[in-house]
C-alpha cells in the first residue's frame, strides 16, 4: 500500500519537472530564448535541487516523513501552476528553481520510508516498483505537455499537472501513514560525516553523478533533438523522446529489482553488480541515439538505452542503503541527490554549448564515454570494497 501511494507522488514529481522540455520550441519562439538560456531554464531546477539535497536528507532523518512528502507535493504543484503564469525568462528560471526546492524533499523521505517497511531481501523489488513511476511520470509529462502545448498553448500542461498534484496532496493528508523509524538518529551527530564510514558510498555517489549527467541530457534535449533533426511535430517529439526510452526502462527496472535481490542473497555487492551490467550494456545505445540517421534504429537505440538504464536505476537507493546505517538513510539519499544533480545541472548548459560547436548528434553520442567511465568505476569499487564474497551458500 505504501509503495502504491508513493508511486503516484513520484509520478507527479517527474511529470512536473519533465513537462517544460517538450515545449522548449514554443518558449523559444514566444520569448526569443537562445539554446543557452533554455539550458539554464532546465538547469535552474537541478542547481537548487542539488543545493538543498543534504539539508532535505538531514531533515528527513529527523522530521516526520509524511509531512515532508505531502508538504513538498503541494508546494511544488503550486509552483508548477505558477510556471504557467510566467511571461519572461527570469520568471521561468525563478519558478523552475523553486520547483527544485520543493521536489528535493521527496526522495530522501520516501526512500527512508520504503526501507523502513522492506528488509534487504525485498528492498530492490520495492524500490524498483516505485522507480517505475519515474518513467511513467516522465512519459506523461513529456507527452501531454507536447500534445497540450501544440493544441492549447505551452501553459496548459502546467495547469493540469499542478492542479492534479494539489488534489493528490489533499488525499494523502488523510491516507498516508508514518512508519516507525528503525533507529533514532542522535541529535547533534554529523550524519554526513558518518555516511562515509564505508568507502563504497563515495563510489556509488560518483557513479550516480556521471549516470545522472547522461540522463539529464536525454531528458532535457532529446525532445528538441527529435524536433530539429528528424522533423517530428511537437507532440510526436515529446512522445517519442520519452515513451520508447521510459517504457523500456520500466521493463529494465523490474528486471533489475528481481535480479539484484537474487544476487544480493549470494554476494555482498550483488546490487552493484546488477548496476554495472546496466551501465556497460547501455554504452553502445547512447552512441547510436546521437549518431543514427534512421528512425527505426533511433527507436531501437532509445529503447536499448532505456532498458539497461533501468537495470542501473532499480538499485540506485537500494545499493546505497546496503552500505549506510539506517539512521543515515534519508541523509544519504539527500547527499547522493545533491552531488548527482550537480552533475545533472551542468549537463543542459554543457550540451547546449557543445552542440553549438560540434552539433547535437556528436554531443549526445560522446556521452557514451561517460557511461563507460562510470561502469568501470562501479566494477572497480565493488571488487575492492564489497569483495564479491558469498554471504549465503
What are these regions, as identified by a protein language model?
Residues 18, 46-54, 138-139, 246-254, ...:
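Residue-level signature of mid-helix packing/kink "hotspots" within the transmembrane helices
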Residues 20-21, 199-254, 313, 317:
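Extracytoplasmic gate region of multi-pass secondary transporters
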Residues 32, 64, 85-91, 119, ...:
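Helix-breaking motifs and short loop linkers at transmembrane-helix boundaries and internal kinks
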Residues 51-87:
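Conserved MFS/SLC helix-loop-helix module at the cytosolic interface between two early adjacent transmembrane helices
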Residues 67-81, 271-286:
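Structural signature of the two symmetry-related core transmembrane helices
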Residues 95-136:
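Cytoplasmic helix-loop-helix junction between adjacent transmembrane helices
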Residues 130-174:
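Helix-loop-helix hairpin linking two adjacent transmembrane segments in secondary transporters
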Residues 178-205, 229:
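Juxtamembrane intracellular "pre-TM" segments in multi-pass secondary transporters
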